[in-house]
Amino acid sequence: MTQWSVQRRFPRFPIILPVLHRLKDRAAAPGVGWTRNLGETGACLELAEWVGTGTGLVLCLRTDTTDIEIEATVVWAGERGRREAGTLHGVSFTRIAPDHHKALRDLLRQKGHVRQAGVRLPVELTVLCRNVGHDTGPIQGRTGDISRAGLLLRLPVALPNGTTLEVTIQTSHGPLTAKGTVIWVDPSGQHVPGEPIRHGFRFTDVGWASELTLAMLLAGQL
C-alpha cells in the first residue's frame, strides 16, 4: 500500500488535545504537550521536550469524555524548539486497546470535520479578569470549560463583545495569565438575577509557558 493510499484511508484532522507522554517501559514523570493533528494511525504532537526518532512512547490523550492511552513510536522530530515554543513530532501508533481504539474513532467522527477542533474540558476555577485599556478594578468570576483556544467565563456583570481582557487563573503550578477577547455573551433576556452571566472568551496572546501550564491543568496534572 502506498503512503498516499494510507493517508487517504486514514486522514489526519486538526483536533487539539492536551497530551501526556512518557518513555515506554520506563517509570518517569510524564511530559506534556498538545496534539496538532490526529488520525487513526498517528498524530503530530507539539511537546515541551525534544524526543528522538525511533523512541517508543506511551501517550495519554485527554478528551471531554475519557482518556485515550496509545503506544506510539516517534517517526520524525523537528528542530529543538526555542524556549518560547514547543517542538513538533510525528508519531505512528503501534498499539491501542480495543476500547481506547473505539474512543479514538468516536472522537474522530465527532470532531474530525470541525475546523481547528479544540476539545473543551469542564474545569471550574476562580478567574480574575482585567479590562485592558480601562482603569477599573478586576472582575472575579469562574471558568466553566477550557480549551487551548479559549474558555467559558461566568461573570457577575455582562461585558460587550469585543472586550479585551487579561485573565489570570490560579493553579497549583502558579498563576496562568493570558490575554483575549470576549466573542459572545448571553443575551440580556436570558440573564437570571443573581446568577453569573456566561461569556465566550478566545485567547489571543498566550505564552508557551502558560500553554504548558494549561496543558498540565487540562491533563489532570495540577
What positions do the PLM features span?
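Structured alpha-helical
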Residues: 1-222
